[in-house]
Every structure is written in C-alpha cells, then in structure tokens.
From Swiss-Prot:
Mg(2+) 3 binds at D449, E457. One of its GO terms (biological process) is beta-caryophyllene biosynthetic process. (2E,6E)-farnesyl diphosphate binds at R268, D305, D309, R446, D449. This is Beta-caryophyllene synthase. It catalyses: (2E,6E)-farnesyl diphosphate = (-)-(E)-beta-caryophyllene + diphosphate. A motif (DDXXD motif) lies at residues 305-309. Mg(2+) 1 binds at D305, D309. Its EC number is 4.2.3.57. Pfam families: Terpene_synth, Terpene_synth_C. The Asp-Asp-Xaa-Xaa-Asp/Glu (DDXXD/E) motif is important for the catalytic activity, presumably through binding to Mg(2+). Mg(2+) 2 binds at D305, D309. Keywords: Lyase, Magnesium, Metal-binding. One of its GO terms (molecular function) is magnesium ion binding. It comes from Lavandula angustifolia (Lavender).
C-alpha cells in the first residue's frame, strides 16, 4: 500500500538522495521459540470457558435494552467481536428491524448515537434523521447537548460514518470536535482519555487489534466496566499475541536467509513493520498463512520500490522490468547480482503461494496476484523514467500512475488471494474494475501518503501538482487535497451500507488496508521512519503482553 511500499519519488532534480535507517528489530523475534509461544491446555480450556460465558451473556441480554448496545460496543472495541460475529449481527439486525424505541422522544443523545453508530457500522442503513430531535428550529444543536460529553463523544463517532448528503452528520462532526476539545481541557479521567483518542483516530478509522490494546487501558479505569469481558479480552489478546510471535520467529528466519541488509543495503529493511501492517488487517488466528505470505510480499514490494526509486540505473531497470513482466526466471543472468538476488526471492515467494493455495483449492487466484505485482513494477518503472528524464507529469498523468504505484491494488488482490475465504473469479474481476469503494480507497491511501511526505527533499506529490496547475497557495492545495480525502471516506462509508456490491470479506479487506494508511500517515511517514511511533505501536501489539 501507499505508505509502506511506495516512496513515490518523482524527483524534482537529478538527485536520488535517500538514506534509510537500519532494521530496528534485527533478529529480536528469534527469542520467541516454540517453548515460549506454546499455549497450554489449561489456558485453552480457560479461554473457551470464558468465551462461552460471554456468549451466554450476549444471548440472554434483551436486544431492546441499552445494556445490549453497551455490551456489543464493549465486545467489539475490546477486540473480541470476531468470536461472536453471528450473535452480534443477529442482535443488531433485530434492533434495526424491530426496536420500538429507535425513534422514541425520550431517547438521550448518548444512547441514540451509540445505536445509530453500531447499526451503521454493521452495514444497515440507519437513518440520520434520528438526530433531528437534538436540533432546534434554526438547525443548531440544542444548548443542553453542548455539555453532554458522553453524548457528544458518541455523536462524534457516529458522524464519522456519514455518507454524502447527510448534512446533519457533517454539522455534528464539526460541532462535536470543537466542543469535545473544549470540554476535556485539563481533564484526566477515563472519559477524557477516550475523547482524546477518538479525536486523533475515530472508531471508523481504527484498526481492531491496536484499537483494542488502547481501549482496554481506558475501559478498566471505567468504574462500570464488565470484569468478565475485560478478563477474557486480556486473555484472548495474550494468546493471539503468542501466535503472532511464533509467526514472526519464522519470518525473521526467512529474512535472515535473504540477507538483503548486505546484498541490497540501500533498501528499507522493515520485515517486522510489514508484519505489523498485516496484523492490522488480519489478526485472527485462522489467517496465519495469509499473514506470513503477505508479510513477505509487502517486504519485497517495499524493496522493489527502492530498487526503482533510489538505486537502479535506467538501463538496469529496463531489463529488470522486462523480466518481471515476463516472470522469466531463466533470464535473470542478464541482471546485476543485487537484482538477481531480488528476483529469486520474489519468484520463490509466489511459488510458495501457489503451493499453499493449492492445498485449499485456490490456485486459480495466484495468477491475479502475480498480475498485480507485475503492474506495480510497471508503474514504478514509469515513475523512474519520469525521474531520469526530469519530466513533470500533469495531475491527471500523475494520479493515473500513482494510484497504482501506491501498492494498494496489489496488496488488496494479494491478500484476497492468500486468505482462506473463498473469493470467486467474478469477485476478483469486480475488484479489478475499480468500483467506487476501491477508487475511493486508492485515493485516500495515495493522498494521505502525499500529504505526509510533502516537503521531503526531491519528492513531488499531489500537493505540488495541484499548486502548479491551479495557481494556488500551499495552504489552499492542502485544504483541497484534504477535502478530496474526506469525500472519499464518505464513498467508502456508503459502499459498506446495504445493499452492498461485495461480500463483507472483501469490504473489510478494502477498509482495513485504508485504515493502516491513516495510522501510518496521519502525521508523519511512520514506515520510512519506524524508530519512534511505529516501534512503540509494534511493542504494544506484538511484544508486551497484558497483565491479567
């Protein structure tokens, strides 16, 4: 995807001056041996017992109660919703279809906004008219709403699921953002922590695993928290973390055998960061094969970008691109040693993919994955040609290439290839047709990357092209690009609401990959520089267990 893979250096001069910091983690995860990551029978039995207790609690709590809404919200935010997907879906479907208090006059803002958000988040077309009762005749929010912190927080979260044309939610987002910032100044309690976290990244843009890790620390400070839920969430987090550590041990061994640090020292060496990225999308235990393959693919795509972007000569890149286009391992002798080493690693991973997908009768999908990797290389080559010739493309030319060189399409197709879920050929072709949700996500990932990278020496972006073509200031260009991103998010939201054009599996993949970019590029390039923010995030999810 945009951030981890593509640096997108359409250079403004002859220089290709990029120096990346060394691998932060090196062989750290080799310490997680099979003995350390083994899960005891007693732990598995305790996990199962607690899970069934929560399932019973879900089934026994009435759908038409506020308690059910709060229970579902807590389960999802604690990162354990994947155990109860059917129960949660059925409850929210029932609430959407039959709940008699949905439009009750005595509904308070906290409950109304929570109900709306849970239903909309589940994909049901909840009407935003439910919030009109909180607005006066002039269209302004009533005065008593202004000081209801919990109500405002829930309304803020709900308004982030807005689609085009929902003016009341657009107004709510602006209103709630300002009021919440003002009301929580100087506050240090659990609620204020939740507000500050939400204002940084709302639920609609939060990755499940990382969001759960952060939410647990706030949830346990809440006096009304459910101890059963919290204990199970912590146990589940720790057990799944052991699975991730075991996989990282294997990936680290693969990385050491490649020895890219020696053979391709110019490239970003980020295998653990790539794994962290994939955990953001597919953290559940059943996706182990996909996580391993996708980590290798992202890592190789990142190195591929650096070969084109900062090291290869135009003559080398021309032959290199032809060999990848033909997927011709017999022609690798034409390449310099570092490119031969790279090509062998790339071709080997796709052989591994073919073997693994053959076991689950999904071999047909591998060709789609290869084609997107080839297309990614073609776009990198186009950008390299622009850089060598000092050509400055138009905004239209730039986006035609940059939306693909972001790597987002390649990663979407490769991920849907490697997961166990069945994805039909018709569904692959639908994705490749670039439907609205794909186009919107491509736009978000590319432009988020461009905003984060703006000002980097030698790097051109959508901001530069917009300024040049429209004769506007830097501030105006930033505002316009930010507006395009906001509009694209509404497209994403709309496509996730019934009637939907694709399965939940596909939509989740598309949305979660987009969320990864929001995380990594919300205020800096946290992949290119992974020594601070990203390192801390990785520690919280993949290294440090929770204390139970």
């Amino acid at each position: 995807m945009a951030a981890p893979i593509s640096t997108n250096n359409v250079c403004s001069d002859d220089a290709r001056p990029v120096t990346y910091h060394p691998n932060v983690w090196s062989d750290y995860f080799l310490r997680y041996t099979s003995e350390l990551t083994e899960i005891s029978v007693a732990k598995k039995e305790e996990h199962e017992r607690q899970k069934e207790a929560i399932r019973n609690l879900l089934l026994q709590t009435r759908d038409d109660s506020t308690l059910k809404l709060e229970l579902v919200d807590a389960i999802q935010r604690l990162g354990i919703g994947y155990h109860f997907e059917e129960e949660i879906h059925n409850s929210l479907r029932n609430i959407y279809d039959t709940n008699p208090i949905y439009n009750a006059e005595d509904d308070n803002l906290r409950v109304a906004a929570l109900r709306f958000r849970l239903i909309r988040q589940q994909g049901f077309p909840a009407p935003c008219d439910v919030f009109r009762k909180f607005v006066d005749e002039e269209g302004e929010f009533k005065s008593w709403v202004s000081n209801d912190v919990e109500g405002l927080l829930n309304l803020y979260e709900a308004s982030n699921f807005a689609v085009h044309g929902e003016e009341i939610l657009e107004k709510a987002l602006e209103f709630c953002s300002l009021r919440l910032e003002f009301l929580t100044q100087g506050m240090t309690n659990s609620l204020s922590m939740r507000v500050k976290e939400a204002l940084k990244i709302p639920i609609s843009k939060t990755l499940t695993r990382l969001g759960a890790r952060k939410f647990m620390s706030m949830y346990q400070e809440d006096e009304s928290h459910n101890e059963t839920l919290l204990n199970f969430a912590k146990l589940d987090f720790n057990l799944v973390q052991k699975i991730h550590q075991k996989e990282l041990n294997q990936i680290t061994r693969w990385w050491k055998e490649l020895d890219f640090g020696k053979n391709l020292p110019f490239a970003r060496d980020r295998p653990v960061e790539c794994y962290f990225w994939i955990v953001g999308v597919y953290f559940e235990p059943r996706y182990g094969i996909a996580r391993t393959l996708l980590t290798k693919i992202i890592y190789l795509a990142s190195v591929l970008d650096d070969i084109y972007d900062v090291y290869g000569t135009l003559a080398e890149l021309t032959i290199f691109t032809q060999i990848i286009r033909r997927w011709d391992s017999d022609a690798m002798d034409q390449l310099p040693p570092y490119m031969r080493i790279y090509c062998k690693a790339l071709f080997d991973v796709y052989v591994e993919m073919e073997e693994e997908m053959g076991k689950i009768r999904k071999s047909y999908a591998v060709e789609y994955a290869k084609k997107e990797m080839k297309r990614l290389a073609e776009m990198y080559f186009q950008e390299a040609q622009w850089a060598f010739s000092k050509y400055k493309p138009t905004m239209k030319e730039y986006l035609k290439v940059a939306l693909i060189s972001s790597g987002y399409m390649m990663m979407t197709i490769n991920s849907l290839t490697t997961i166990e879920d069945l994805i039909t050929e018709e569904e692959f072709n639908w994705i490749l047709s670039e439907p609205r949700i794909l186009r919107a996500s491509l736009t978000i990932t590319r432009l988020m990357d461009d905003l984060a990278g703006y000002g980097t020496e030698g790097k051109m972006s959508a901001v530069h092209y917009y300024m040049a073509e429209n004769g506007v200031s830097e501030g105006e260009a930033f505002k316009e690009v930010s507006g395009i991103i906001k509009s694209a998010w509404k497209d994403v939201n709309a496509e996730c609401v019934e009637p939907r054009a694709a399965s939940t599996t596909i939509l989740r993949c598309v949305v979660d990959f987009t969320r990864v970019i929001v995380l990594l590029y919300s205020d800096e390039d946290a992949y290119g520089n992974s020594q601070t923010k990203t390192k801390d995030l990785i520690k919280s999810v993949l290294v440090d267990p929770l204390i139970i």
